[in-house]
From Swiss-Prot:
Known catalytic reactions: L-histidinol phosphate + 2-oxoglutarate = 3-(imidazol-4-yl)-2-oxopropyl phosphate + L-glutamate
Modified residues (N6-(pyridoxal phosphate)lysine): K208
The protein, known as: Histidinol-phosphate aminotransferase
Co-factor(s): pyridoxal 5'-phosphate
Name of the top EC class for this enzyme: transferase
Top-rank taxon, per record: Bacteria
SUPFAM superfamilies referenced in this protein's UniProt entry, alphabetically: PLP-dependent transferases
Pfam families per the UniProt record, alphabetical: Aminotran_1_2 (PF00155)
InterPro entries xref list: Aminotrans_II_pyridoxalP_BS (IPR001917), Aminotransferase_I/II_large (IPR004839), HisP_aminotrans (IPR005861), HistidinolP_aminotransfase (IPR050106), PyrdxlP-dep_Trfase (IPR015424), PyrdxlP-dep_Trfase_major (IPR015421), PyrdxlP-dep_Trfase_small (IPR015422)
Entry GO MF terms: histidinol-phosphate transaminase activity; pyridoxal phosphate binding
Name of the gene encoding the protein in the UniProt record: hisC
Pathway given in the UniProt record: Amino-acid biosynthesis; L-histidine biosynthesis; L-histidine from 5-phospho-alpha-D-ribose 1-diphosphate: step 7/9
Catalytic activity, EC: 2.6.1.9
Originating organism: Lactococcus lactis subsp. lactis (strain IL1403)
Swiss-Prot/TrEMBL keywords: Amino-acid biosynthesis, Aminotransferase, Histidine biosynthesis, Pyridoxal phosphate, Transferase
Amino acid sequence: MSWQNNLRSVSPYIAGEQPELTDIIKLNTNENPYPPTSVAQLFNERYKTKNLRLYPSTDAKSLRKKLADYHHLEVEQVIIGNGSDEVLSLSFLTFFNSQSPLLMPDITYSFYPIYCELYRIPFQKVPVDDDFKVLIKDYCIENGGIVIANPDAPTALALNLKDIEEILKKNQNSIVLINEAYIDFGGETCLPLLKKYDNLVVVQTFSKSRSLAGIRLGVAYGSAEAISHLYDVKNSFNSYPIDSLAQIIGEASLMDEHYFQKNIQKIIKTREVFKDNLVNLGFEVTDSKANFVFVHHPKVKAEELFKALYEAKIIVRHWNQPRIDDWLRITIGTNKEMNKVIEFLKGYLKKNEEIDEWKK
């Protein structure tokens, strides 16, 4: 028997392209177009090159304390991971060990079913409605847990706090995992519900609203008991997942609330103007509460538009996936970048109309 017979087969997650070209408009992986707050002050106070010879803190307690204070929680309710993907992975491995299926929307972050396949977790995709909305009643069935991205990726739609609480009430024997990667761009965080529900785990990230995708910092919040179980699993893999520099930069990003909120508002304003411009061009656009928009044009195939944008050095995201294969996800960049996208789309659509007229 060959060793290949013992391999665990899995279809890996396909990340958005990270091109090395510099003369492009990169709108495919939901990065923040603005730089993070200055870290120079904290580096001068805390960072010493000689400290690189030492292992980092095993639990990033200083950063956890600042996050706990920021959200009015206890430090025992916070765990830091190497990006939210690691925190999600640990959560799947820790909490979803039932024979009943883990429930998730059929249109959502594509890493979820991969975790299930990798960890052999039974799961069930629950169809969203024709407008991509999650139907609360569909999550009131027997399950081994629930995972929902709020706002969702790629649809950018968000549930309100009342809907999430209804799911929590109806599933008090299961962990309900809410992924809030994009919550700062217009959604309503469910962190206040941690005071009432010990079956709630909330995952957030420094990658999007805090402009720190390059250092990989993710966070989970929950009851002290739930977080302690996450630590048990985390420490079974890696005692030192967060390097010292990332911990310092994470703390620095929490120091300037004014700068943080100003950047958020700039992105939201750009998003709303961009949405209006798209609608004027005939696009259908979901009610985005994220730093991206999900769009469809009735007269243009999404795959063809994706390729045309790519040739114009504008990189967006397209999936060959049922129900959304005629939609594109476009990250919100700077005003200048989004204006260039609109100008390209105007020219592309006009050219298409002329071709259609000629064919007639």
